[in-house]
Curated annotation (Swiss-Prot):
Domain CRIM, chain residue ranges per copy: 139-267
GO molecular-function terms, A-Z: enzyme-substrate adaptor activity; phosphatidylinositol-3,4,5-trisphosphate binding; phosphatidylinositol-4,5-bisphosphate binding
Phosphoserine modifications at: S128, S186, S315, S356, S510
Documented activity regulation: Phosphatidylinositol 3,4,5-trisphosphate (PI(3,4,5)P3) promotes MTOR activation by relieving MAPKAP1/SIN1-mediated inhibition of MTOR that takes place in absence of PI(3,4,5)P3.
GO cellular-component term (any): mitochondrial outer membrane
Name of protein: Target of rapamycin complex 2 subunit MAPKAP1
Family membership noted in the UniProt record: Belongs to the SIN1 family.
Lineage: Eukaryota, Metazoa, Chordata, Craniata, Vertebrata
């Protein structure tokens, strides 16, 4: 055992004794603060002195280099073990073997058979590089496109070509629509024109895209340069234009409509438009009537009857009981279905089932309706929105926007940034198909500034009621508009609702009669 009182030697011994056993290198950091104290105790020598060692009183060497251990050299590759020469040589041999595998050795052999000069010449025959005369034949697709280029440059609808989605299928939302063109000849109108449009386009942009593609394909007859002269109607799969519904709103986005078949129809701006639109035939039937629009008086009564039956049955199959037409003024006298409307000299008829008569009291004489009422009934199918308040349970109200059209009723909540919605009911958007509507009645009218109406519809085999409030004028307009739509459609849900309501009324009347009878006997 050795006793040392020199701190310099002790520090050097601790730092250098554990070099091989300490992987962390913490031995070099032992008592590192004492180096500063030693420098203060033993200041460095003057520049004139030679050497860096300090002699103590006992003659022992006092100066040591304490920066790091003597066995560790500081460099950038500290901690990286160098590869030995053997490993480097083995790596070089491995690469040489891989290169030898990639190389293919071919042994040269002398040719035994002798070939003539002519045979050798035939192996490498000289090709003729003379220019061949141009072959006159069918034009290439590029030539045809270049010839059609001036036509495309003169297309007045070029601004709508940016809505063409044929080059964006799979990358951007697009919509494929089959468009029928009634303005074509009788043969061309049977085949639709397929248009691929961007989903973000409006109806007006789609009309312009249809006109652009129509003109680019060189179709005849030529279109009007004004896009506003055309509109889009709903069409059947066979190309028949559905005139029961109004044209699509030109300002609405096309992705809002789920129709895959449309028809491009020209808007009539001539003075004869009013007389053409006012040709309506009224067909009275059980539980309502229908207004059938005709183009002229040359239409046969059979076509009018088929349209009336299809209108009453809606999406159901037309097959079923047979019907006949009778003039409103001549009961029990069947109309010849092969005759024209012009020969009948009447505009009001009755739809009667075969083997039955109007004497049973099924039909009642309705008062003549004026043309203003007819126009109101027709305009009721046009979309119109109203701002009303929806009444919930506990008399809570929510401001909503009520949109009414011929095919559905939409209820969209109106967000109010100022009012706090913490204690209010959060209303979700509701869309009700017109075939599911049952009734719309005025529930309460307290004053001209406050009225309540009830909307009844079928949902999951159950009848639900929604209550709304607004001023009396708005409520009366909504009730009248919805009732016009219900009378013109005559859906099965509405008929079942009134039948169930009548059964409940009869059951209630029968119960009250039995109760009065028992009390009389007592």
């Amino acid at each position: 055992m050795a006793f040392l009182d020199n701190p310099t030697i002790i520090l050097a011994h601790i730092r250098q004794s554990h070099v091989t056993s300490d992987d962390t290198g913490m031995c070099e950091m032992v008592l590192i603060d004492h180096d500063v104290d030693l420098e203060k105790i033993h200041p460095p020598s003057m520049p004139g002195d030679s050497g860096s060692e300090i002699q103590g009183s006992n003659g022992e060497t006092q100066g040591y280099v304490y920066a790091q251990s003597v066995d560790i050299t500081s460099s950038w590759d500290f901690g990286i073990r160098r590869r030995s020469n053997t490993a480097q040589r083995l790596e070089r041999l491995r690469k040489e073997r891989q290169n030898q595998i990639k190389c293919k050795n071919i042994q040269w052999k002398e040719r035994n058979s002798k070939q003539s000069a002519q045979e050798l010449k035939s192996l490498f025959e000289k090709k003729s590089l003379k220019e061949k005369p141009p072959i006159s034949g069918k034009q290439s697709i590029l030539s045809v496109r270049l010839e059609q280029c001036p036509l495309q440059l003169n297309n007045p609808f070029n601004e709508y070509s940016k809505f063409d989605g044929k080059g964006h299928v799979g990358t951007t939302a697009t919509k494929k629509i089959d468009v029928y063109l009634p303005l074509h000849s009788s043969q061309d109108r049977l085949l639709p024109m397929t248009v691929v449009t961007m989903a973000s386009a409006r109806v007006q942009d789609l009309i312009g895209l249809i006109c652009w593609q129509y003109t680019s394909e060189g179709r005849e007859p030529k279109l009007n340069d004004n896009v506003s002269a055309y509109c889009l109607h709903i069409a059947e799969d066979d190309g028949e234009v559905d005139t029961d519904f109004p044209p699509l709103d030109s300002n609405e986005p096309i992705h809002k409509f789920g129709f895959s078949t449309l028809a491009l129809v020209e808007k009539y701006s001539s003075p004869g438009l009013t007389s053409k639109e006012s040709l309506f035939v009224r067909i009275n039937a059980a539980h309502g009537f229908s207004l059938i629009q005709v183009d002229n008086t040359k239409v046969t009564m059979k076509e009018i009857l088929l349209k009336a039956v299809k209108r009453r049955k809606g999406s159901q199959k037309v097959s079923g009981p047979q019907y006949r037409l009778e003039k409103q003024s001549e009961p029990n006298v069947a109309v010849d279905l092969d005759s024209t409307l012009e020969s009948q000299s009447a505009w009001e008829f009755c739809q009667v089932r075969e083997n039955s008569s109007r004497a049973d009291g099924v039909f009642e004489e309705d008062s003549q309706i004026d043309i203003a009422t007819v126009q109101d009934m027709l305009s009721s199918h046009h979309y119109k929105s109203f701002k009303v308040s929806m009444i919930h349970r506990l008399r809570f109200t929510t401001d909503v926007q009520l949109g009414i059209s011929g095919d559905k009723v939409e209820i969209d909540p109106v967000t109010n940034q100022k009012a706090s919605t913490k204690f209010w009911i959060k209303q979700k958007p509701i869309s009700i198909d017109s075939d599911l509507l049952c009734a719309c009645d005025l529930a309460e009218e307290k004053s001209p500034s406050h009225a309540i109406f009830k909307l009844t519809y079928l949902s999951n085999h159950d009848y639900k009621h929604l209550y709304f409030e607004s001023d009396a004028a708005t409520v009366n307009e909504i009730v009248l508009k919805v009732n016009y739509i219900l009378e013109s459609r005559a859906s099965t849900a509405r008929a079942d609702y009134f039948a169930q309501k009548q059964r409940k009324l009869n059951r209630r009347t029968s119960f009250s009669f039995q109760k009065e009878k028992k009390s009389g006997q007592q």
